[in-house]
Amino acid sequence: SFVDNSRSRLSREVKIFFPHGRRIARISYLCRGKNAGYMAERPLILVCNDDGIDAQGIAALTSMLLPLGDIAVVAPDGPRSGAACSMTVTSPVRLRLLERAPGLTRHSCSGTPTDCVKLALEHVVERRPALMVSGINHGDNASVNVHYSGTMGAVLEACMKGIPAIGFSLRTRDSQCDFTPYSDTVTRIASHVLEHRLPQDTCLNVNFPQVERLRGLRVCRMARGKWSSEWEPAEEPGTFRLTGHYTCLEPGAEDTDWWALDHGMASVVPQQTDMTSTRRADALKALETMP
């Protein structure tokens, strides 16, 4: 970084190396005015995922968020899809520093996405994150898929720690997909949460359809759905491979995430850590008087 006093400008450049050296993103931060020699502390943003530290999605997400604050990436050292909120309880977890640059650190973790968040808060960051962001996941986490999601497992862990948290996912399995069409929406949502925070015990599950241009954004609820035919025999006798067929149980419900994705819109679903079914509690009051 350098200070150009004649033009009263502070400029800082950070390089983000994408997986396998495919491309480099350079972001410059400029501060103008009479106090240009002084830069206020930028918000700290914790970044995680469940596809692993080398996934394209987390590299793209990091570049999108860099203009908004200092970034601490702590992500699994390999794919952890379907990890949900699981954590490592039977063996030690290894944390490795991969990169340290102005405004950016990157660590890999041998554990789950939940482990990554726990370790980051206790052994990586030196101040409390203003925001935690997970993704961008290769594959949507809409409808019931949110319950299996390691992407959202990391988000829920941060939310339980009182940190505003967002999960971003893309409806695709293409490991080399283009995340550019979603950049503006990611930064707009992240900026809004940084400024206004979120209600207590509430986080956001954001999903994108794979389109060249979004048709809009819909704040909605998760659709009811189910999986069937989930296991098929593998080559070795007695072993099985996860597969499955998803069915949306309310495909015509326009207030759901699945409908929004089917119609080219981003879906934003507020999730909460309190899983109490308060609407059903009264119907079960009879249990209190059972003999």
Describe these PLM feature segments.
Residues 4-7, 15-24, 29-31:
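Short terminal hydrophobic/aromatic SLiMs and anchors at protein ends
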Residues 40-41, 45-48, 56-123, 127-128:
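A cross-family phosphate/adenosyl-ligand binding-site feature
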Residues 51, 79, 112-113, 137-140, ...:
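Short glycine-rich anion-binding loops that position phosphate/pyrophosphate groups of nucleotides
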Residues 131:
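Short, Asp-centered acidic motifs that coordinate Mg2+ and/or phosphate
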Residues 140-149:
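Glycine/threonine-rich flexible loop motifs
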Residues 159-181:
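Glycine-rich phosphate/pyrophosphate-binding loops
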Residues 179-291:
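Electrostatically charged, flexible surface regions
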